From Swiss-Prot:
Cited InterPro entries: Alpha/beta_knot_MTases, tRNA_m1G_MeTrfase_C_sf, tRNA_m1G_MeTrfase_TrmD, tRNA_m1G_MTases_N, tRNA_MeTrfase_TRMD/TRM10
Superkingdom classification of source: Bacteria
Protein name (record): tRNA (guanine-N(1)-)-methyltransferase
Annotated SUPFAM superfamilies: alpha/beta knot
EC number of this enzyme: 2.1.1.228
Protein's organism: Salinispora arenicola (strain CNS-205)
């Protein structure tokens, strides 16, 4: 995968040399380039922002440097990348979107600052490439850099060969619309707390059922919206019994066997 990131703080992305993302870069699985937006300014002050039309607080990022940056990194006539713009006004980022982005060959991130990027930049970009405005959640950050770090980590770990055990992707939170069950390791007893006996039983069927039950209970308690979004046919009678025991009425519909 080829990724370009444009920011006025390129040094913000130094952590992308570390851990599994760093390995993905070293192996060529992830080809990442970080660009300074100010490289596309032409005044002595390297200006990237100005006051907003219509008044109001803060500053808005000017269209000229952004236009030149996008022209340079996504030349007209070439295969367009997918442009991602982190913004509190964007669609919520999710594991499903991470999987969608992991299938792209070229991602281009535009890190806004201040009150955001002049809307004309995004409107013009949308005429020649797919544009997705994306939000990490219902809160506001100083800029898009933190969001890009989060999105890149979520996407990179889905690329082939990045994780040593691809089975990790099947059991983790959000993989099947549920939060992950609690995890335990050695020792079996610690500070008067023992690992659940079923996990030490060696009975893989019982272990899988225990984990499913725990995932359902945890998701009901912490993210009832996720339970409500599950397809009724994805729940078997045992699932429904667990949910009802946790105080949640499973939606009516076909029942999984």
């Amino acid at each position: 995968m080829h990724v370009d990131v444009v920011s006025i703080f390129p040094e913000y992305f130094a952590p992308l040399d570390l851990s599994l993302i760093g390995r993905a870069r070293a192996s060529g699985t992830l080809r990442l380039a970080v660009h300074d937006l100010r490289a596309w300014t032409h005044d002595v002050h390297r200006t990237v922002d100005d006051t907003p039309y219509g008044g109001g607080p803060g500053m808005v990022m000017r269209p000229e440097p952004w236009g030149e940056a996008l022209d340079a990194l996504a030349p007209p006539g070439g295969t367009p990348p997918r442009l991602l713009v982190p913004t509190p006004a964007g669609v919520p980022f999710s594991q499903a979107l991470a999987h969608e982005l992991a299938s792209e060959s070229h991602l281009l991130f535009a890190c806004g600052r201040y009150e955001g990027i002049d809307q004309r930049v995004l409107d013009h970009a949308a005429s020649r490439m797919p544009v997705t405005e994306v939000s990490l959640g219902d809160y506001v950050l100083f800029g898009g850099e933190v969001a890009v770090l989060v999105i890149l980590e979520a996407v990179t770990r889905l690329l082939p060969g990045v994780l040593g055990n691809v089975g990790s992707l099947d059991d983790e939170s959000h993989a099947h619309g549920l939060l992950e069950a609690p995890m335990y390791t050695k020792p079996a007893a610690w500070r008067d707390r023992e690992v659940p006996a079923v996990l030490r039983s060696g009975d893989h069927g019982k272990i899988a059922r225990w984990r499913r039950n725990e995932a359902l209970v945890r998701t009901v308690a912490r993210r009832p919206d996720m339970i409500a979004a599950l397809a009724p046919e994805s729940l078997d009678p045992r699932d429904r019994a667990v949910l009802e025991g946790a105080g949640f009425s499973a939606p009516p519909g076909d029942v999984a066997e």
